[in-house]
Amino acid sequence: SYIKKNIYEKLNNIFENRNNKNSKFINNSRIGNLKFNNEKKYSENEFPQQSIRLLGLARYWNIINYFFVYKNDLEENWDKVLLEFIPKFANSSDVSEYHLVVQELSSKLYDCHSMVRSDILDEKVFGRFTPNFRIEYIDTTFIISKIRTEKYDDKQLKVGDIILKMNNEPLKERYDELNKVFKGANPPSERRIINPYLLSNTDNQMSLVILRDGV
C-alpha cells in the first residue's frame, strides 16, 4: 500500500464511524449536491428587502465556509469577503444592482459552476441582443472567429476582423469590467464565460469600430 499504516488506520476509523443518519438540516441530492432541507423560504421577490438580502448573504457565506472544500485555497480570505459584501448587499439600490452584486459574490469562488442564472442580468444589465458572429480573445485582441448564421450575414463584417470598440467603449475596458463579476478557474474558462456577455446589448442596434487588414 502507498498509504502509511497510521494514516490508513485513521482514515479507516473515520470511515467506520461515519454518520449514516439523515440530517434534519442537510442531505445530498442524487447527484451529490447539497440540499438544505429546512431553510425557511421567503418571497420570490426579485429585489427583497434589506434584511432578507443580508440573510441571503449570510446563508451563502455559511455554505461556502462549512462545505466548500477549496475555501482555504481561494484567492481572497473568505472572512474578508463577508465584510466586503455586507455593505454591497445592504446598499443595493435596485434589482439590477442587487443581482449584479450576487453574481460578483459568486465570482469569488473562481468557479464557472457558481454563476448566477438571472433574467434580470440578461435583460436589464447585459441585454439579450447579440451580433451574428462569435469572437475569440487572442493576446488582448478580439477577433471575429465565426459568422453564426450565413443567411443573416449582411457582409459588413468578416472573419478575421478585429473589434476595437462597441458603442464607443473600448472592448478591452468592457472585458475588464465584466471580469470583475465573472471569474473562472483559469483564463480560458473565464473567456468562455465572459465572451457571450461581451457583445450583449440592451438595444437591437450597436456601433462597432473594427480593424481590417491593418486599417
What are these regions (language model features)?
Residues 1-215:
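Flexible, low-complexity junctional segments that flank or bridge functional domains
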